Regions:
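Alpha-helical cap/lid subdomain in secreted, periplasmic
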Residues: 258-405, 412, 425-437
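Compositionally biased, intrinsically disordered or flexible polar/acidic segments
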Residues: 20-221
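Conserved beta-strand scaffold positions in the cores of enzyme catalytic domains, especially
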Residues: 39, 241-243, 345-348
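Conserved catalytic region of serine esterases and O-acyltransferases that act on ester linkages
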Residues: 20-39, 137-139, 159-168, 177, ...
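Conserved SGNH/GDSL esterase-like catalytic core that processes O-acyl groups on lipids
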Residues: 179, 189-193, 200-210, 215-306, ...
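Bacterial N-terminal signal peptides
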Residues: 5-16
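Short, structured coil segments at secondary-structure junctions
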Residues: 122-124, 235-237, 311, 344
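N-terminal secretory signal peptides that target proteins for export/translocation
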Residues: 1-2
Length: 437
């Protein structure tokens, strides 16, 4: 028996795996696809055939299944027989009730009599596109891809262990936009002008899943103090990102709390799974979730690898970024990831090494990249998102083909300035969170 199988058989508190699963242990086939297709025309004027007209005062309700959401205040503007909706005060949100899955969203933006400038975010603030500018008299269309998920799991068979829902232990997570019944699109920027939108469920789109802790999870408010939230803008509209990371998680608790089961319930052949742990794994004061880098941490990583391979997907290990003090606080877990990647022949993105170089290059400005000693600001998340994509290009050829053709890699020794979109207020009711001076 190889070392992988031995490590898996020795796990306590996780599913016991064997090298050759019995037929009854193999994953069930996915449920039949649910089709969803919506077309919306916004503002005054005549809606084209096949489109649903949406006026500025149409608020989302579960019964209707679509509408402006989270207190959005928009204005309908008429331009002859056509129109659009816009706002100059704050971002606005449009939500559609949909089943979980991947969605292709095509928006039309612009104004025949003025300039528009739009940033698009989805769900919990994932940045899809920035600075989409149209001159007066012009419109543009842009397609983005978003993932929608729910916390429910297929219930286990009678008398079988398992759960029917992801375990959420942090206050407020259950109400987060990433878990609700809706696909939410945020329109931001100096002058967003939304003309039309088409939303199509597309089960053939591959998914990039992400697992991790609060250094990776979506923020509740703000422009995104992590790399997954800012990743989509650097990817072609041919792949969805499902960020399943959450605060407080470790490689062990991600499995025992059914988060990994949720990922596996959506995973299909051709998908990708980026796994980053270490910050909470390194806390011995958390005895129920602590992992030792040379033993249990490696074993849990091998569970992720084995289960992902069973489903025909590609796993990538991402070493944790170092904290602001730029010491060696998570170094042992980063080095353990390197060992497992080499032993199991899986791709590795060494974010830990790149982050140490980056924090050194920032010098006194390193404070601008952090919200506190451990968690990133929007600027820090932006910098690491560029390094992650650069790592994908270098080390994960199958995933690199989804990187946008216009992506510009960043050298960690030469950090870029903060992009303008980080100055924008984002999230329902959230105040502006500018980059620190």
């Amino acid at each position: 028996m190889n070392t992988t199988a031995l490590s898996l058989l020795c796990l306590v508190g996780a599913s016991v795996l064997v090298a050759q699963p019995r037929p009854e242990d193999r994953p069930l086939p996915p449920p039949p696809p649910v089709h969803a297709h919506f077309k919306f025309d916004f503002g005054p004027g005549h809606a084209p055939a096949g489109y649903t007209s949406v006026q500025a005062d149409e608020v989302y309700s579960t019964e209707k299944g679509y509408g402006f959401d989270f207190g959005s205040r928009v204005t309908g503007v008429a331009r002859g027989a056509d129109g659009f909706v816009t706002t100059n005060e704050s971002p606005f949100f449009f939500s559609v009730k949909v089943p979980e899955g991947n969605y292709r969203i095509t928006v039309t933006l612009g104004d025949v009599a003025g300039e528009s400038n739009t940033t698009i975010r989805t769900e919990s603030g994932h940045i899809m596109a920035t600075a989409l500018v149209t001159p007066p008299g012009r419109t543009i269309t842009r397609t983005v891809i978003a993932n929608v998920r729910r916390p429910e799991l297929p219930p286990p068979p009678k008398n079988a262990p398992g759960g029917s829902r992801v375990h959420m232990f942090l206050a407020g997570e259950a109400e987060a936009r990433c878990w609700d019944e809706k696909l939410t699109i945020e329109f931001n920027g100096p002058r967003p002008c939304l003309v039309a939108m088409e939303i199509v469920k597309d089960d053939a789109i591959p998914t990039l899943f992400v697992a991790g802790d609060s250094t990776v999870g979506d923020p509740r408010h703000g422009p995104g103090g992590n790399w997954p939230t800012q990743l989509c803008q650097f990817l072609a509209p041919e792949i969805a990102v499902c960020n399943s990371a959450e605060g407080g998680e470790t490689s062990k608790s991600f499995i025992t709390g059914y988060r990994f089961d949720k990922v596996l319930s959506q995973m299909k052949a051709g998908d990708f799974f980026l796994v980053q742990f270490g910050h909470n794994d390194s806390k011995p004061q958390w005895p129920q979730s602590y992992t030792e880098p040379g033993t249990s941490f490696k074993a849990y990583l091998r569970v992720f690898i084995a289960e992902t391979r069973r489903r025909g997907a590609t796993l990538v290990l991402v070493t944790p970024m170092e904290r602001r003090n730029n010491g060696d606080t998570v170094g042992p877990w980063a080095r353990a990831m390197r060992d497992v990647a080499a032993e199991e022949h899986v791709p590795l993105i060494d974010q830990w090494a790149m982050s140490k170089q980056l924090w050194t290059a920032l010098g006194p400005d390193v404070n601008r990249a952090f919200h506190d000693q451990t968690h990133l600001s929007g600027y820090g998340g932006y910098l690491l998102s560029k390094l992650i994509v650069s790592g994908i290009q270098k080390n994960v050829p199958a995933l690199a083909r989804f990187v946008s053709a216009d992506f510009q890699p960043m050298d960690p020794a030469h950090p870029e300035p903060a992009p303008a979109y980080l100055q924008q207020s984002s999230g329902p009711g959230a105040p502006p969170r500018p980059v620190r001076p």
